[in-house]
């Protein structure tokens, strides 16, 4: 990490650096855009470009100071067409008062005043200059400053402040937005001082797959063993993760023990058999006894 050019009060703590490394914010792509070269620390043998985390923190603080300088938070527009950043921009907007555009950016939002979604922000912040290129392009038409999370291969045209970071991982995106929101609240005075911990955990900014959440709820509501042995087997003795040692009274009462005769079985069979076999014998004997029958 390079020596910081910030005032001592803005220096990153060891915990901040550890979080940036744990979220893999320092891992860029294999391609390098020429304007992102100053933020490069080194290139690994496998071709991955490693970003200087010290530069990342400096740009987070710079971006937060720009955001805090705008009097009306509603004049700030945060944008993310990338799914991994949509939850993060919505949470950032909720905590700082900005306006969020999560999902597809409708062309003409900044330039076509006839549309209902027309906006005139004083600043926009985008998650990825490549996927949010339409928003950056329209901002350049109407002279709106742009702050962007830029990877090593991100285009930097019309980007005024580039925060060098990994903008493809969900943890990296969520952490950068969380740190940006925390720094803005510190500068606004919402958080008393820099030693005060923010009660919002970073996990709130991470992307969550809706289908995975639904599957998890379904798994939690399942009765143990229902899939493996069927619903009827649960009633007959499957409890928890093992079968009951003794059978239930209702189950044993209805089944006779092997090797034991049921009372009345032989008598019932012999009576019915004799009664049903007698007509059959007469029927077979009649044709032979009658000499008039010709085969």
Curated annotation (Swiss-Prot):
Does the keyword field hold Cell cycle?
A: no
Kindly give the SUPFAM superfamilies that the UniProt entry links to this protein: Ribosomal protein S2
Binding partners and assembly:
Component of the small ribosomal subunit. Mature ribosomes consist of a small (40S) and a large (60S) subunit. The 40S subunit contains about 33 different proteins and 1 molecule of RNA (18S). The 60S subunit contains about 49 different proteins and 3 molecules of RNA (25S, 5.8S and 5S). Interacts with RPS21.
Q: What is this protein called?
A: Small ribosomal subunit protein uS2
Name the GO terms of the biological process aspect.
Answer: ribosomal small subunit assembly; translation
UniProt lists the family membership as follows: Belongs to the universal ribosomal protein uS2 family.
The record's section on InterPro entries has:
Ribosomal_uS2, Ribosomal_uS2_C, Ribosomal_uS2_CS, Ribosomal_uS2_euk, Ribosomal_uS2_euk/arc, Ribosomal_uS2_flav_dom_sf
One Gene Ontology cellular component annotation held by this UniProt entry: cytosolic small ribosomal subunit
Is Ribonucleoprotein set as a keyword in this record?
Answer: yes
Q: Which UniProt keywords apply?
A: Cytoplasm, Ribonucleoprotein, Ribosomal protein
Bilayer-crossing residues are none
- UniProt lists the gene as RPS0
Q: What does this protein do?
A: Required for the assembly and/or stability of the 40S ribosomal subunit. Required for the processing of the 20S rRNA-precursor to mature 18S rRNA in a late step of the maturation of 40S ribosomal subunits.
Q: Where is the composition biased (Low complexity)?
A: 274-295
What Pfam families does this protein's entry cite?
40S_SA_C, Ribosomal_S2
Q: Which PANTHER family match?
A: 40S RIBOSOMAL PROTEIN SA
Region entry Disordered, spans: 273-295
């Amino acid at each position: 990490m390079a020596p910081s050019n910030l005032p001592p009060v803005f220096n990153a703590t060891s915990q901040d650096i550890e979080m940036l490394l744990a979220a893999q914010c320092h891992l860029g792509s294999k391609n390098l855009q020429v304007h992102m070269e100053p933020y490069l620390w080194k290139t690994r043998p496998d071709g991955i470009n490693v970003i200087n985390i010290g530069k990342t923190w400096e740009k987070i603080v710079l971006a937060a100071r720009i955001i805090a300088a705008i009097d009306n938070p509603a004049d700030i527009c945060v944008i993310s067409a990338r799914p991994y950043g949509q939850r993060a921009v919505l949470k950032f907007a909720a905590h700082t008062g900005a306006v969020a555009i999560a999902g597809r950016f409708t062309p003409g939002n900044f330039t076509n005043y006839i549309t209902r979604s027309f906006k005139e922000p004083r600043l926009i912040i985008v998650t990825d200059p490549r996927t949010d290129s339409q928003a950056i392009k329209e901002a350049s038409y109407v002279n709106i400053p742009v702050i962007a999370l830029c990877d090593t291969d991100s285009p930097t045209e019309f980007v005024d402040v580039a925060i060098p970071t990994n903008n493809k991982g969900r943890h990296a995106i969520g952490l950068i937005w969380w740190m940006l929101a925390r720094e803005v609240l510190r500068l606004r005075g919402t958080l008393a001082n820099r030693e005060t911990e923010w009660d919002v955990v970073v996990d709130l900014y991470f992307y969550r797959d809706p289908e995975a959440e639904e599957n998890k709820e379904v798994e939690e509501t399942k009765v143990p063993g229902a899939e493996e042995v069927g619903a009827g087997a649960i009633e007959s003795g499957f409890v928890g993760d093992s079968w009951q040692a003794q059978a239930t009274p209702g189950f044993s009462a209805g089944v006779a023990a092997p090797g034991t005769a049921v009372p009345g079985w032989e008598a019932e069979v012999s009576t019915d058999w004799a009664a049903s076999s007698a007509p059959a014998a007469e029927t077979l004997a009649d044709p032979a006894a009658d000499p008039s029958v010709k085969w």
